Amino acid sequence: MKALGARSAFYVGFLVGTCSLYLLLRQAGFTRDSGSREPGTHDKTLLEMLEEENKNWKKERSALFNLNHPHHTGEDGALADSLYKRVRILCWVMTGPDNLEKKARHVKATWSRHCNIVVFISSVDNPDFPTVGLNTKEGRDQLYWKTIRAFHYVMEKHSDEADWFLKADDDTYVIVDNLRWILARHSPEDPVYFGRRFKPYVKQGYMSGGAGYVLSKEALRRFVEGFRTKVCTHTTSVEDLAMGQCMEKIGVKAGDSRDTMQRETFHPFVPESHLTGTFPKTFWYWNYCYYPIVQGPQCCSDLAVSFHYVDASHMYLLEYYTYHLRAFGYKYRYQPPEPNVKAPEKVETRVLEQKDKVEAQEEENQSPELNDKL
């Protein structure tokens, strides 16, 4: 018994001593770390970052409305801010329940903050994220059906709140400010859409689904009307090709999204594939691109708009390269023409006039009820 008691006392003492040493070292380490940092330089907690991020969004009708155009304090973003107000872009992102944490949340935290409105389209509703559920199945064979339903949804819910309507996947990275520069030269009242232009099967070409594509307000209206009149139908699961065939039938032009030096802005692969990769001559890509393919540094515009197959970590890398990294002492080598923002400005005036007419009509419709009450 004495041996057992002595052994128990030893273990208890060892445990108490170990715990005391751990607490002492932990406190010493905390003090040392705290002392080595300047006041106010502590890293933000995850909770603080999330709270700061949420301040930029207003959640309404299962959509996220940006409350301001994000850019760095002290940075001259006057032109970007002006375009943000005049060239209003709704971005809807194709995702699914299994991809919200793996992919969609990284889109939400990076490039989508530069859209005016963001809608995440899924097969089921998720009010917390939020996503709009279209009661569709998941899978590649459902892509065009989800696309049809999504454009109908944004037409019904948000047609007066944006001028352009961008479709992107949850593994597509988009530089929305560069997209505004392209769109500012065009009126949203013109039937046109832009993206990475492919050429087979459609006379005027069609836009790559993975690189994303953007419809003008008039193109969106015609697309929805095309299904009502059965000019367009859901006959294939190949989303981008079917979209292009429908666009041609309803008189929506496939626009040229290249910059003034004829360099591509929408890209169906990650940057390194275009910059350093060599596509085999047997690769389908050579036969699909509407314009000649250029590999290497001239592959991509300095004002590139999108890249596809971008994983979560590369979302943040591209965000850093685009909005943070600068080489000291250099001016931009590419001086693009100033965007013409007059056309969207006129459209905004027409939209306001239309809203006034609608409000006046609503007042007339309500007046008999008011008279009855009086």
From Swiss-Prot:
Gene Ontology CC annotations of this record: membrane
Subcellular location: Membrane
Residue ranges of the region described as Disordered: 355-374
InterPro entries the UniProt entry points to: C1GALT1/C1GALT1_chp1, Fringe-like_glycosylTrfase
Reaction equation(s) it catalyzes: an N-acetyl-alpha-D-galactosaminyl derivative + UDP-alpha-D-galactose = a beta-D-galactosyl-(1->3)-N-acetyl-alpha-D-galactosaminyl derivative + UDP + H(+)
Record EC number: 2.4.1.122
Cofactor(s) it depends on: Mn(2+)
Transmembrane spans: 9-25
Pfam families noted in UniProt: Fringe
GO molecular function: glycoprotein-N-acetylgalactosamine 3-beta-galactosyltransferase activity; metal ion binding; nucleotide binding
Disulfide bonds: C91-C115, C232-C246, C299-C300
PANTHER family assigned: BETA1,3-GALACTOSYLTRANSFERASE (PTHR23033), GLYCOPROTEIN-N-ACETYLGALACTOSAMINE 3-BETA-GALACTOSYLTRANSFERASE 1-B (PTHR23033:SF45)
The protein's role, per its UniProt record: Glycosyltransferase that generates the core 1 O-glycan Gal-beta1-3GalNAc-alpha1-Ser/Thr (T antigen), which is a precursor for many extended O-glycans in glycoproteins.
Subunit structure as annotated in this protein's UniProt entry: Homodimer; disulfide-linked.
Protein name per Swiss-Prot or TrEMBL: Glycoprotein-N-acetylgalactosamine 3-beta-galactosyltransferase 1-B
Organism of origin: Danio rerio (Zebrafish)
